[in-house]
């Protein structure tokens, strides 16, 4: 039969750990790059493995940015996530886990505590984050450093970029079904729990609600414009009048756009 039971990448990663030498392990991609000047900083980075620190991440330089408009978008996306976002996830939110390359692991700990990722087919679409969550649930800590970086290529075609976004969104959906996140929800404090939700599954849920709200908002504004309710008048008693039927503002009345009515802007009036 097929010797690969789960997803290929995490299966290979966890199987290869037993053949690695040394105390620390760095996860890389095939299109990863590095620079001699940055390699000299690795010794300083490894000094950060003190106490319960199990993972140390750092940023990447996307060298495929000049490959076109899609490549520029993918590089900009990775720049924001790999620097500003991950810096904030590590502290003060404390919800940065493992996102694959180029994180450095405590290999001795990972060797005996479940590996660097999980490989169940279908469920662990985003296999890397489960390795980091496993480390956190076992009492480990995740750090992030910015004084060192390595090179990385990103998608340069629309099809590849779209497939990557589908993988990320699908992986976040399955995270909500996993027992790992269930255990995290029971063990995290409220602030950390809300941070976990809004930086993971909740981000896509909020984006979906926002997109649908935008569609309905545009449709409602168009309908109000067609029936002559682009503006309305509110008098001092709070009564609402259409400018079409009243002929504009009178006396102490105030004129508002229809957007105020839809967005509950009357709260400011009361």
Language model features: what each stretch is:
Residues 158, 167-270:
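Basic/Trp-rich segment in TM-proximal cytosolic loops or flexible interdomain/linker regions
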Residues 1-208:
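Internal catalytic domains of large membrane-associated glycosyltransferases
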């Amino acid at each position: 039969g097929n010797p690969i039971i789960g997803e290929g990448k995490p299966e290979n990663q966890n199987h290869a750990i037993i053949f690695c030498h040394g105390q620390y392990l760095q996860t890389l991609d095939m299109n990863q790059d590095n620079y001699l000047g940055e390699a000299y900083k690795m010794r300083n980075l490894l000094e950060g493995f003190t106490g319960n620190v199990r993972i140390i991440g750092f940023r990447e330089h996307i060298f495929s940015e000049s490959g076109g408009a899609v490549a520029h978008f993918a590089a900009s996306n990775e720049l924001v996530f790999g620097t500003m976002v991950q810096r904030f996830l590590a502290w003060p939110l404390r919800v940065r886990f493992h996102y694959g390359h180029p994180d450095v692991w405590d290999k001795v700990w990972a060797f005996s505590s479940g590996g660097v990722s999980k490989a169940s087919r279908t469920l662990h679409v985003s296999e890397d984050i489960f390795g980091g969550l496993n480390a956190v649930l076992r009492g480990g800590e995740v750090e992030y450093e910015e004084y060192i970086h390595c090179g990385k290529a990103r998608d340069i075609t629309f099809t590849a970029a779209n497939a990557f976004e589908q993988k990320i969104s699908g992986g976040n959906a399955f995270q909500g079904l996993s027992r790992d996140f269930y255990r995290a929800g029971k063990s995290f404090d409220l602030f950390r729990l809300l941070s976990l939700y809004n930086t993971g599954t909740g981000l896509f849920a909020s984006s979906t609600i926002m997109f649908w709200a935008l569609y309905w908002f545009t449709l409602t504004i168009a309908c109000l414009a067609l029936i002559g309710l682009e503006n309305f008048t509110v008098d001092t008693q709070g009564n609402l009048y259409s400018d079409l039927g009243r002929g504009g503002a009178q006396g102490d009345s105030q004129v508002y756009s229809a957007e105020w009515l839809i967005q509950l802007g009357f709260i400011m009036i009361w």
